[in-house]
């Protein structure tokens, strides 16, 4: 899907942009692997918000350290956004495990923080891509991320649960949406500050919760509702001048 989109969008094929895209893809593939390992073996109520806050925080620090200078309101928005990410990402352990409280062991902590760092590095990698390169860096990113996934599958072949054929159209649709979302993110990085784009992108759990309420009619906890409100405030603050 990403190759088709890149061919249609055009743009310059440069070694640097493809390399940054490839690096972002490797980091993203590792991030997804470790994140689901942590979710499968640890308490989601800890794993999810910790990962989300790490993902939101590291690119902000890197962006500011490398020259980003957001305005005062944007700085306030960044702080509110990081808090919002933690709130909307929080889940009860029973939601996923159906049991009490899995232990947050040192191995789970490594997977949790490691996945957050890897996601953040993926954001930072995309943020280094120059303008005029179209979606080719995204195609490069998806290629290396897919390679990581297949390597993981190869080393855990007996434990793999393959999707049924009836899910294929849904999976293709998800792939197309993923390309659209990440293409938009790539263009946002090319025309915005790493710190601001990353922290807004990290608010995606808020959109997931909002869609669950609107489309599925789910009820949200007070904590998540507070997180949704904080996310709205954060976006408004980052968008305002000064």
Q: What residue ranges belong to the model's regions?
A:
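Juxtamembrane helix-loop-helix junctions in multi-pass membrane proteins
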Residues: 1, 11, 120-145, 196-199
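Membrane-interface interhelical linkers
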Residues: 1-23, 35-42, 92-110, 144-173, ...
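Alpha-helical transmembrane segments of compact multi-pass small-molecule transporters, enriched
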Residues: 1-2, 50-64, 144-148, 181-185, ...
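Hydrophobic transmembrane alpha-helices of multi-pass small-molecule transport proteins
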Residues: 2-3, 57-61, 72-92, 223-242
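C-terminal transmembrane-helix exit sites in multi-pass transporters
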Residues: 9-10, 56-76, 86, 152-156, ...
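Hydrophobic residues within alpha-helical transmembrane segments
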Residues: 19-26, 50-54, 76-79, 110, ...
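Glycine-/small-residue-enriched transmembrane alpha-helix faces in small-molecule transporters
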Residues: 30, 86, 97-136, 173-177, ...
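Structural motif at transmembrane-helix junctions in multi-pass transporters
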Residues: 34-50, 130-137, 184-203, 219
């Amino acid at each position: 899907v990403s190759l088709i989109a890149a061919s249609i969008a055009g743009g310059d094929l440069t070694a640097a942009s493809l390399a940054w895209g490839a690096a972002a893809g490797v980091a993203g593939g590792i991030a997804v692997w470790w994140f689901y390992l942590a979710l499968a073996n640890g308490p989601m109520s800890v794993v999810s918000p910790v990962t989300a806050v790490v993902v939101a925080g590291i690119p902000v620090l890197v962006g500011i350290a490398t020259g980003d200078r957001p305005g005062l309101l944007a700085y306030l928005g960044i702080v509110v956004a990081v808090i919002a990410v933690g709130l909307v990402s929080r889940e009860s352990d029973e939601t996923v495990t159906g049991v009490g409280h899995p232990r947050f062991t040192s191995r789970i902590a490594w997977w949790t923080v490691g996945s957050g760092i890897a996601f953040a590095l993926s954001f930072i990698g995309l943020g280094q891509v120059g303008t005029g390169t179209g979606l080719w860096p995204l195609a490069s990113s998806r290629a290396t991320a897919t390679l990581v996934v297949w390597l993981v599958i190869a080393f855990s072949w007996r434990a793999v649960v393959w999707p049924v054929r009836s899910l294929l159209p849904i999976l293709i649709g998800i792939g197309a949406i993923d390309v659209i979302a990440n293409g938009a993110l790539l263009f946002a990085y090319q025309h915005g500050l790493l710190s601001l784009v990353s922290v807004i992108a990290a608010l995606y759990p808020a959109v997931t919760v909002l869609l669950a309420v609107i489309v599925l009619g789910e009820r949200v906890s007070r904590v998540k509702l507070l997180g949704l409100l904080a996310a709205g405030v954060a976006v408004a603050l980052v968008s305002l001048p000064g």
